[in-house]
Amino acid sequence: MKSLSSAQIRAARALLRWSAEELARESALGLATIRRAENAETHSMTAANDLTVRRVLEAAGVEFIDENGGGPGVRLRKPLKGE
């Protein structure tokens, strides 16, 4: 499993309408960890934290799309509640 890119994490949060603080809370990681992971220049996250963020976002309905020649991406697997 390839690690998440900073753009994928930011896009996943945007799809869920989550703030960085919400992602930090849901993943039980520090806000500074989330901010570093989302910064393309300092993208730095351990494999364990990457997996934690992936699992939290996937549980919330995000699906990560492999590069497949067109670049990695994200989409919602199911509609948000109330939509």
Where would I find each of the regions flagged by the language model?
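A detector for short, charged/polar N-terminal pre-domain segments
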Residues: 1-5
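Recognition helix of helix-turn-helix/homeodomain-like DNA-binding domains
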Residues: 29-45
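DNA major-groove recognition helix of helix-turn-helix/homeodomain DNA-binding modules
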Residues: 47-65
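Helix-turn-helix/homeodomain-like alpha-helical modules used for DNA recognition
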Residues: 62-83
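Short basic helix-loop element that most often maps to the first helix and adjoining turn
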Residues: 9-22, 82
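Residues in the helix-turn-helix
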Residues: 22, 33, 52
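Residues in the recognition helix of alpha-helical DNA-binding motifs
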Residues: 12, 26, 37
